[in-house]
A protein has these predicted regions:
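Conserved beta-strand-loop surface patch within small alpha/beta domains used
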Residues: 1-80, 88-144
Length: 144
């Protein structure tokens, strides 16, 4: 897989940070709508979601709400191009994340509510040189 990037606007980062802060100490989650052109995922809309788990170690998005978002994305001629969630630890995928990343091979943005750092990862079919098939991708911050 060639070097991937995900572009996010400053205003979208603010929404994700607010989502994480409001849910703390529990994990927060959001869906990222947009498009992919060649090696660039472009986020067009951030949709904060409710974490059904109300947990510090996991998140689950309600299936009915998830279906609504997929239909909404389709109506905008976009798709879900990323999943965001927060960790009350370092911003790296957990073992559970890795399992779901393989099922949903789109960018996963993870924010640490401890260090405030945000990183992005994706499951890669070509796992050579990557840990558990997970590859970090560049997060490109775009001015509004």
């Amino acid at each position: 897989m060639s070097h991937l990037k995900i572009a996010i606007r400053v205003s979208q980062l603010i929404i994700l940070n607010q989502t994480a802060n409001l849910s703390n100490p529990y994990e927060s989650c959001a869906l990222l709508l947009g498009s992919k052109k060649e090696n660039l995922y472009e986020i067009k809309e951030v949709i904060p979601m409710n974490n059904k788990d109300s947990s510090e170690v996991s998140f689950t998005i309600d299936e009915i709400e998830l279906l609504k978002i997929y239909k909404y994305a389709e109506s905008l001629n976009t798709s879900v191009v990323g999943i965001f969630h927060s960790h009350p630890s370092k911003p790296f995928p957990s073992e559970t994340d890795k399992t779901f990343m393989e099922i949903n091979p789109i960018p996963w943005l993870i924010k640490s509510t401890i260090t405030e750092e945000m990183r992005c990862f994706i499951f890669s079919d070509s796992s050579r040189g990557k840990i558990d098939g997970i590859e970090e991708i560049d997060l490109v911050i775009v001015k509004d």
